[in-house]
């Protein structure tokens, strides 16, 4: 949508991209016919460490299903966060600037890294974006998300998660009303392990090494 407004810039980018001798495509990529030589690789992800022992020092977190939330600026102000309190056997962790008056929603600061919180959670609730999906899958965490309008990659990510049974897209009405329980329990039954290639970094390094060696 709106591409015609930027047609001059898009044409210039297409011309520049066409000069590339190789395009490296991690998982969930969009098919294009601009660059002829392509190489698909695994996900490229940020690796974290499990910090659940630190998290469980906070009263109310121990022995609960842990859901990590990352939405950034994607309509978070429209979500009825107070309804999360109805999910009494779950806790929700986030680094986003969300309300701090919801009993089971913990807003953490930068002492906790995003990738560590993902590694320590049971499931990830996020906007469908590459970096969060790849980090979740690298730690064998299933994902729940909602639709993203005007985000061209969304359809590819939605189909990828559906085909591999590693995540699901919630109905928008349920998402914004925080009616998440059924979808969380459904997604928790998904297994990510062994379903997606995670060796993107190694493959890219090999490609670069071959190029440098000529």
Residue ranges and their predicted role:
Residues 1-76:
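A nucleotide-sugar donor-handling region in carbohydrate enzymes
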Residues 12, 112-113, 132, 179, ...:
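Short acidic active-site motifs
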Residues 22-24, 39-41, 93, 106, ...:
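Hydrophobic/aromatic beta-strand patches that form the interior of the parallel beta-sheet core
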Residues 46-123:
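Donor-nucleotide binding loops and adjacent catalytic segments primarily
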Residues 67-70, 144-145, 169-170, 195:
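Short catalytic-loop micro-motif centered on adjacent basic/acidic residues
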Residues 113-156:
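A donor-sugar binding/catalytic signature common to diverse glycosyltransferases
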Residues 142-187:
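Nucleotide-sugar donor-binding patch of glycosyltransferase catalytic domains
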Residues 181-214:
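C-terminal amphipathic helix plus adjacent low-complexity
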